[in-house]
């Protein structure tokens, strides 16, 4: 049986970030401040979803939601959304310690940033030798928290032709998605996206910046009722 994944070529526009008031706590593993949204789950999730979900778009997420519900995965409601994502975030931070993967939180959405030096060989969609171990840890946590949509986005720097970079980012996102599904993640939960070179997180004028832009991001969005 072949599984179908949503894989889209996209053009991003700048998003307006909303300032949200929430309780902040110090993460025991990194010392950084993070948002604890258990008490404000629904309100924060709606606002942040517009930002974190900008890559795949609401249509793709709605299709995943319907597919997940059809597969018997129930949604979250109210303050339970924030509490659920709090626990998932904590487990991911523990699992990703020492891997080079950063875990960030915005409202009810979690993003894993996987830098290019641990993900893929240069110019290739073949996994680097150390990357499967990282993905195994990610899959272990994601299987525990199945009430989340998983958006896998590949990103590149601007070296070479834009068309090539777009295709490479799509292949890399698809490779990661396939690997996670092979480890037991339900395909109904996944969205595979190639962002190409159009969403940099650093300047492409330096090697350090280009290295930062070569990455895979996993965005985890709660499945809400």
Positions of PLM-derived features:
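Bacterial N-terminal signal peptides that target proteins for export
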Residues: 1-11
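C-terminal motif of bacterial Sec signal peptides marking the signal peptidase cleavage site
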Residues: 18-22
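Short, low-complexity, glycine-enriched hydrophobic/amphipathic alpha-helices that associate
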Residues: 26-91
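Stable alpha-helical elements in mature extracytoplasmic
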Residues: 47-48, 88, 92, 131-134, ...
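Second-shell loop/turn segments in exported
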Residues: 78-81, 119-127, 162-165
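Periplasmic peptidoglycan-binding/anchoring modules of Gram-negative envelope and division proteins
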Residues: 95, 120-154, 181, 211-213, ...
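Periplasmic OmpA-like peptidoglycan-binding domain that tethers envelope proteins to the cell wall
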Residues: 155-225
